[in-house]
C-alpha cells in the first residue's frame, strides 16, 4: 500500500476563473465586500457553478453567510454533467487544489459514507472534467481562510437520482446536516434557456422572455424556500425547468424534511438572483443563477 497523496488539480483555473492566486483573492474579496451577512451562520447554502465572470457576484451572497469560526466540515454536493450516474459518487483523491490553497478531503467521513454501500467512486478523469464541485472550491477556501487548517471537505457528485433515492440520500445526510459544525454547499444553476439548451418555455403574460424566465425561476425558488421536496419535484415535472442541480437540491430538501420530523426548526431564504443575459428573442440564450442560505433557529 502506498501512502502517496493524490491531488485533483484545479482543472478549470485559467479558463472558468483566474489561475492567479492573488488575482483570484482580490476578485473574491471584491464580490464579498459588496454583500451583507444577514443569514449567518448558514447551515447550508445554494450557489451557482458557472464561470466567475458570470456568477461570481451572485455566489458571494451565499458565501458571505458562512461562519468560519464554527464550520469544520464542508459537504459539497454537485450534479454530474459528463458521466451518467444513478447514485452518488465520492472522489478518489486526498487533496483538491485551488489557486489559493489546497483543501483536504475528510477521509473519516468518506469512510462512513462508503460503508453504507450507497456510493461509487469517480475516476480522477471524471473528477477533473466536472466543474460543479470545483467552482465552489475557491469560494470555500476564501470564506474559510481565517481557519484554513481547521476544516475538511466532503465532495459528493450527485447522479440523476429517482425521488426515492433523493429521499434515501436525504435521510443519510440529515444526521450530518444536524451538526452545527457542518456546512452543506449545494451546487446549482437555475434556468438554462434557449435553443442551445433545447428549452424555450415562455409565458407571454410575463412580457419579455427574460421576465418569463425570472418568473419561472422564482416560482421554483419559492418552493425551495417552503422546504417541500414533493412540491419541488412536481414543479420540475410540470415545467421541466432546466435547473441542473435539481438532484442535489432534492437531497438537501429531503434531509431538511427528515430533521423537521425530529422537531428542528429551519428556514431557507434566497438572497440574490441574476441572469447571464436578458433574453428578448428566440435566438437568445441565458443561464440563471441564485444564491441562498439555510439557517437553523
Swiss-Prot record:
A GO biological process held by the record? regulation of microtubule-based process
Q: What is the effect of changing residue 54 to A?
A: Diminishes interaction with ERBB2
> Listed GO cellular component terms?
cytosol; nucleus
Phenotype upon changing residue 244 to A: Abolishes interaction with ERBB2
Q: What does this protein do?
A: May control cell migration by relaying extracellular chemotactic signals to the microtubule cytoskeleton. Mediator of ERBB2 signaling. The MEMO1-RHOA-DIAPH1 signaling pathway plays an important role in ERBB2-dependent stabilization of microtubules at the cell cortex. It controls the localization of APC and CLASP2 to the cell membrane, via the regulation of GSK3B activity. In turn, membrane-bound APC allows the localization of the MACF1 to the cell membrane, which is required for microtubule capture and stabilization. Is required for breast carcinoma cell migration.
Q: How does it assemble?
A: Interacts with ERBB2 phosphorylated on 'Tyr-1248'.
The family this protein is said to belong to: Belongs to the MEMO1 family.
By what name is this protein known? Protein MEMO1
Amino acid at each position: 500500500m502506498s501512502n502517496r497523496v493524490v491531488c485533483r488539480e484545479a482543472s478549470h483555473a485559467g479558463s472558468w476563473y483566474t489561475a492567479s492566486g492573488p488575482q483570484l483573492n482580490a476578485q473574491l474579496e471584491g464580490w464579498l465586500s459588496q454583500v451583507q451577512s444577514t443569514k449567518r451562520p448558514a447551515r447550508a447554502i445554494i450557489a451557482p457553478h458557472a464561470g466567475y465572470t458570470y456568477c461570481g457576484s451572485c455566489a458571494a451572497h451565499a458565501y458571505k453567510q458562512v461562519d468560519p469560526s464554527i464550520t469544520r466540515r464542508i459537504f459539497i454536493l454537485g450534479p454530474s454533467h459528463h458521466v451518467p450516474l444513478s447514485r452518488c459518487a465520492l472522489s478518489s483523491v486526498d487533496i483538491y487544489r485551488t489557486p489559493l490553497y489546497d483543501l483536504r478531503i475528510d477521509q473519516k467521513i468518506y469512510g462512513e459514507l462508503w460503508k453504507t454501500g450507497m456510493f461509487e467512486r469517480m475516476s480522477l478523469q471524471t473528477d477533473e472534467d466536472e466543474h460543479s464541485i470545483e467552482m465552489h472550491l475557491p469560494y470555500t477556501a476564501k470564506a474559510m481562510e481565517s481557519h484554513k487548517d481547521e476544516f475538511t471537505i466532503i465532495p459528493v457528485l450527485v447522479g440523476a437520482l429517482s425521488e426515492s433515492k433523493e429521499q434515501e440520500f436525504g435521510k443519510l445526510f440529515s444526521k450530518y446536516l444536524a451538526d452545527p459544525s457542518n456546512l452543506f454547499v449545494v451546487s446549482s444553476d437555475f434556468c438554462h434557456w434557449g435553443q442551445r439548451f433545447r428549452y424555450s418555455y415562455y409565458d407571454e403574460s410575463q412580457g419579455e422572455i427574460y421576465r418569463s424566465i425570472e418568473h419561472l425561476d422564482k416560482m421554483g425558488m419559492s418552493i425551495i424556500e417552503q422546504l417541500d421536496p414533493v412540491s419541488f419535484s412536481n414543479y420540475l415535472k410540470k415545467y421541466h425547468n432546466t435547473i441542473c442541480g435539481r438532484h442535489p437540491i432534492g437531497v438537501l430538501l429531503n434531509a431538511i424534511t427528515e430533521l423537521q420530523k425530529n422537531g428542528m426548526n429551519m428556514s431557507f431564504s434566497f438572497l440574490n438572483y441574476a441572469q447571464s443575459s436578458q433574453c428578448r428573442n428566440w435566438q437568445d440564450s441565458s443561464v440563471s443563477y441564485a444564491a441562498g442560505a439555510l439557517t437553523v433557529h
